[in-house]
Amino acid sequence: MLGAHGMREKNVFYEESSHVPLMIKMPHEIKKKTTVNGYVSNVDLFATIMDYLNVGNYKSDGESLRDLIEQKQTNHGNYVVTEWDYRGPIQPNYMIVKDGWKLMIPYTEDSKVLNVLYNLNEDPHEMTNLLGKNPNRKKYKKKAEKLRLKLLEWLKKNNSKHYDGVSKRKLI
């Protein structure tokens, strides 16, 4: 992070750390200078490689990006989730980004860590937390709850042990 947000580490959910370019080179398969914009994740890499190698019957939590890369598909997903479970509930453990909005939340109901909501369309440098100590935070409760519901859907799909903590967490 090199000092952004007063931090020098990479294990946080700010854009400088979590929004990184994904570059794939596969001669004779992927056209040079192909650019794809959208929500993708590292978890999709394995499935993409296996797809390009024509390996069938593999298990993966991700989905192949091949149709997106080859422009047979225009939208891979409408949100992305990132999780961090190294230090416990002393920092946000989950991040969900959807439609230019980002929610960061710990996985326990009683963590002292502030919930964080950013409108990346208006605040791309994430300088104003719309939740936390913001006096106007109630105005953003509906948006935060919508993001949390999408996160809970993802947690359930992935059989996360943190589903209950995230669902019981007070947002405002």
Positions of predicted regions on the chain:
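C-terminal cap/loop subdomain of S1 sulfatases and analogous C-terminal strand-loop tails that border
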Residues: 1-4, 43-46, 51-116, 158-163, ...
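Histidine-centered active-site microenvironments of extracellular/periplasmic hydrolases
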Residues: 1-32, 41
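Active-site rim elements
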Residues: 9, 29-40, 52-56, 115, ...
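Acidic-residue sensor for enzyme active/binding pockets
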Residues: 15-16, 83, 126
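Long, internal low-complexity/basic segments
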Residues: 19, 41, 130-172
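A short aromatic-rich beta-strand->coil structural motif
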Residues: 22-23, 49, 97-138, 147
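Short, hydrophobic secondary-structure boundary micro-motifs
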Residues: 32-34, 61, 77-78, 127-130, ...
